[in-house]
Amino acid sequence: MKIAVIILNWNGAKLLHQFLPSIIQYSENATVYVADNASTDDSIAVLKRDFPTVKIIQNKSNYGFAQGYNEALQFIDEPYYALINSDIEVTENWLNPII
């Protein structure tokens, strides 16, 4: 079953370093996306340099929470998805109840 994990980000380079590793590690059967809400920090550079397996969706503006996710979902092909905040640390098998 294909599932997308989508993290909304705005100026969260520090949070990406802190929490994205667990999401990547424990989402082995998912495609991980970061939807960036027009960050002005180095979030995009951090993603490209340190997390090359993560797919980046660059929103044109800071759309806020709901619209930011809605904009990102236009680029997702997977039939199922999990929307999570950038300050969430996941644990092993966290996706099992969803799939």
Positions of the model-derived regions?
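A short, amphipathic alpha-helix embedded in the catalytic core of nucleotide-handling enzymes
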Residues: I23, L47, A72, W94-I99
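Short, acidic, metal-binding catalytic loop of nucleotide-sugar glycosyltransferases
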Residues: S22-A30
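Short beta-strand/loop segment that forms part of the nucleotide-sugar
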Residues: N29-A38, I57-N59
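Cell-envelope/extracellular polymer assembly enzymes that use nucleotide-activated donors
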Residues: K2-A4, T31
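Acidic donor-binding/catalytic loop of UDP-sugar-dependent glycosyltransferases
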Residues: D42, I88-I99
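Short aromatic/hydrophobic "clamp" motif used to bind/position activated sugar donors
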Residues: Y81
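Glycine-rich, basic loop-to-helix element that forms the pyrophosphate-binding segment
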Residues: N59-I76
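A conserved acidic beta->alpha catalytic loop
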Residues: S22, D36-A45, S61
